[in-house]
Amino acid sequence: MNIGFLTRRSSLRAGSVTVGLLLTLMSLSSTAGAQQKLSKRYPAAKNVRIELRNISGTIVVESWNKDEIRLSATIESKHALVLPRQIDQNLVINVMSDNRGKGDVGDINFKLQVPVNSIIDLETKRGNISVANIRSDLVRAHVSLEGDIELTNINASNVVAQNVTGNIFFEGEFSLGGNYEFKSNKGDITIRIPGNSNFRLVAASSARKIALNDFWNKNFKTQDGRRVVGDVGDGRSSVSVTNFSGQITFLRK
């Protein structure tokens, strides 16, 4: 057996592993070095308006028991700008405007902790939107291309959730006289509300996939299975649900 040959081959293997490891570490270091992190706090009234226009990346909003806003962001590209502005005590973040003409600026992932009564108005082209534990006049989430929307423990007078591709989940309550609109081109829409909810529903599904479950009653009128119109209880809230290719499901919580 040629021991020298085996030793040289082992050394080559060890060298290859070492080089591979170094390249991996260099890649991770480069990625970490290019990434920016932003963390800021702003004083806020209890009914402050939060307006965020993103391009790509996740948006997470949740309430906390403080009269201030805590903004955290992870910015993928060192060339991307995030310039939050307070206007009349409201917080405006417009990534689209701040980076106009720059081309692809990568993902920017946001997390905001806000007063429970904050008005929430969110948009992104790509990425998931999650909003939790808000009681206010408005919660709006709009994904213009692809991403899921999840609204949990929401009690708002007006709710708008729209996307093109992705699922929409709403769990909360319908307020007296409130307006609620849910719309997706491709994805499932699930609405989970108390069994004693009162609302007038207009639901449309080109795929004929509408499941009202416990909320179905004889007052509903259907049109070829593609459209359902009717009242649940006294119909004091207005609910519109449109889905072009996915399922519409109502669940009782």
Describe the function of each predicted region:
Residues 1-253:
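Intrinsically disordered, low-complexity terminal regions
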